[in-house]
Amino acid sequence: MTELDYSKLGLKVGLEIHQQLNTNKKLFCDCSTTLDEKHHGTLQRYLRPSFSEIGEIDTAALFEWQKGKKYLYQIPFNSCLVEADEEPPHGLNREALAVVLAVAMSLESNIVDEIYVMRKIVIDGSDTTGFQRTSIVAMGGQVIVEGKKIGIQTIALEEDAARKISESANETMYSLDRLGIPLIEISTAPDITTPEEAEKVAFRIGQLLRLTGKVKRGIGTIRQDLNVSIQGGVKTEIKGVQRLELIPEIIKNEARRQYELLKIKDELVNKRGLSKTIVENEIKELELTHLFRNTNSKIIKKELEKGGLIYGIKFKGFKGIFGRELMPNRRFGTEIADYVRALAELGGIFHSDELPNYGITSEEVESVKKELGIGENDGFVLVIGDKEKLKVAITKIKERVLYAFVGVPKETRVALDDGTTKFMRPQPGSARMYPETDIIPIKIDESILNFAKSFVPENPETKLRKLIEMGLSKELATEILNSPRLDLFEELSKKYSPKVSPIVIATTLENYIKYAKSKGGDISVITDEVIEEIINALYNDKISKDSIQEILVDYSTSKKPIRNIVDNYAKITDEELNRIIDKILDENKDIINQKGEKAFNVIIGKVMNVVKGRAEGKKVVDTLKLKMKNYPRT
């Protein structure tokens, strides 16, 4: 696919950055914000939508309720009745509010006089209450990226959702350990005009948040939601972008999807002379189960054995439309299939542009065409499944196909790991918000503002200069400044330097962990506690700094206790080093006799393989050089 001209397309992108705050307590109770894999029980919920304060039911909430799911919640040991929705929320976490106010100050936002906590209806099971508590803290402001001002619309403080553990067709299991962790949400204006600019803005906001020293790190602690539109399209919400580097690809693919959908609309209307009314009036749907009684298609056989039925739906003039690619490996037919999976919970759908295939023969395709009365330019969709679900599926298929005459549907999509997206649910509306009646309004006074000033992040340029003054090279200082481990670096440097150089700490965090990953290590196990265990051993002269790299490799590949691995790399004495070198020299005396001091590179490699960082590299080199110089030659 050729690259699109985003300025001509009128691309507009807004970001919603969600970041967990690193506070000791949750937003509305005193429970710990540490995730806990252990639990002492479960509770069960069925959730249903409620009317908003204006008497309406939100479409997204209605969509989730119609799934009829049961929700189970693991109760960790650090959980209380607030998370189970058996007790009213306590007062809002003052520390979390101060951090959000500090971010608002740095973004030049207008802080509200009084904070009102609202309930945002969410009944996908991620909140036991059926709603998420959220509150606007500031509005307006800006972030400057490469000289361009990107507007900030709102800054909010809200509670994070429960952590999903597993999911099946009928029930979803969550853990309550994440529910209620304070979360800052920063929403930008749709001022971003290229995919690459979106990544830079997200990075800049993420950097600002890290510079507060009060945000959590790791998978799931930060996510970016995108709002993307082009001229003639609509604002599409894309949820759950976990990796910063995926942002440009996702935006490119969404812009392409909207562009292709608008092209389909233009072709149907202006080139094929069709309209929604014409196609709708000539839709034909028939049960076609009898045509596939002797099929060789494994997919169809499986459904028929379960008592499923097959229906065919004719769409006048749609030949070639279902197979039209909207983004890499995702076609218009894929969009319809996504709708059916999400809205009717059926997976068996085929369209005329991909058949014969999947074990469906050309003879079976011709039989379908004959039964449905398919003309030369017509298309059809086959859908397979349970009779009751088929009713919903057929309705949704017709709705989505006919929407091709409108263009781009207003929907919420979910980001996939390959940079594409798929339909998630209808877009929520204004009917999902109403006031939280259990929490009184919170006045923003001088005391909370003064508290917030202690968290206002430094300017990145100022922070970079300070890192360089600590002895780091500009390159290493920049890596640490941009690293999610910046706060850990500062904490360890304050605690262990000057005895342990900040350069060693920074190199460990930025280079040695990457080295462990390159050697096949699972670096997710390298926690802050593991890093500190290693730095502490170095501080107490138990290990050499040259052993850190190998310790991390061994730990991330073996998963043995870190203390055991550190003990294996304990410093050797000078006497032991001398014995090792003498032994290797004696074993390689023939090479030394042949090459003399030129044999050094061979010998040092053998020595290092035995020493494995248990002595400082310089000491090993100097000792070997001296011994080789005085080694007797024949």
Curated annotation (Swiss-Prot):
GO biological process entries: glutaminyl-tRNAGln biosynthesis via transamidation; translation
Alphabetized UniProt keyword annotations: ATP-binding, Ligase, Nucleotide-binding, Protein biosynthesis
Catalytic activity: L-glutamyl-tRNA(Gln) + L-glutamine + ATP + H2O = L-glutaminyl-tRNA(Gln) + L-glutamate + ADP + phosphate + H(+)
Signal peptide: none
Cross-referenced Pfam families: GAD (PF02938), GatB_N (PF02934), GatB_Yqey (PF02637)
EC class of the enzyme, as a word: ligase
Top-level lineage group: Archaea
GO molecular function: aminoacyl-tRNA ligase activity; ATP binding; glutaminyl-tRNA synthase (glutamine-hydrolyzing) activity
Regions crossing the membrane: none
Stored Gene3D superfamilies: 1.10.10.410, GAD-like domain, GatB domain, N-terminal subdomain
Cross-referenced InterPro entries: Asn/Gln-tRNA_amidoTrfase_suB/E (IPR017959), Asn/Gln-tRNA_Trfase_suB/E_cat (IPR006075), Asn/Gln_amidotransferase (IPR018027), Asn/Gln_tRNA_amidoTrase-B-like (IPR003789), GAD-like_sf (IPR004115), GAD_dom (IPR029351), GatB_C_1 (IPR042114), GatB_Yqey_C_2 (IPR023168)
Job description of the protein: Allows the formation of correctly charged Gln-tRNA(Gln) through the transamidation of misacylated Glu-tRNA(Gln) in organisms which lack glutaminyl-tRNA synthetase. The reaction takes place in the presence of glutamine and ATP through an activated gamma-phospho-Glu-tRNA(Gln). The GatDE system is specific for glutamate and does not act on aspartate.
Assembly: Heterodimer of GatD and GatE.
Protein name: Glutamyl-tRNA(Gln) amidotransferase subunit E
Organism field: Sulfolobus acidocaldarius (strain ATCC 33909 / DSM 639 / JCM 8929 / NBRC 15157 / NCIMB 11770)
Gene, per the UniProt record: gatE
